[in-house]
Amino acid sequence: LQRTNRIKHALSLYRYHEEGKSQFDKSGVRPPSEVDLEVFHRWVKESVALHRQSKAFWKEAVDMLGRDALARVKYEDFIDEAGKVETMERLAGFLDINGLSYAASVFKKATPDSLEAAVVNFDELADRYRGTKFAKFLTE
């Protein structure tokens, strides 16, 4: 399972490690974060490093097992219930499992999917990454 949006992944890492907030919580959405931009940038770099490691692992797995033996699942596939159901159906087909049922989770996503809603100082964050390779992640 991998997240494609580096900024949102970094925010998840930041909230967990710097604020002690879990991504999912039974109590639901938590207040937005005011991020320290320097600390946040360290988590952006960590997200990039983790992404590189994941890509290297995926390449080795494909080389070893072949592409047909693997199914890639992205975090973004699980954002909403429709995506979860579709992904579970795809995985059931991949695994050749009939009658797989899916029950909605009791956990609610703790961080809003919109960066503007999740970060108090979003404008500062956007200014920091505008014009960089991360700019595209600000609006996804």
Can you describe what each PLM-predicted range is?
Residues 1-60, 64-70, 78-101:
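PAPS-dependent sulfotransferase catalytic domain
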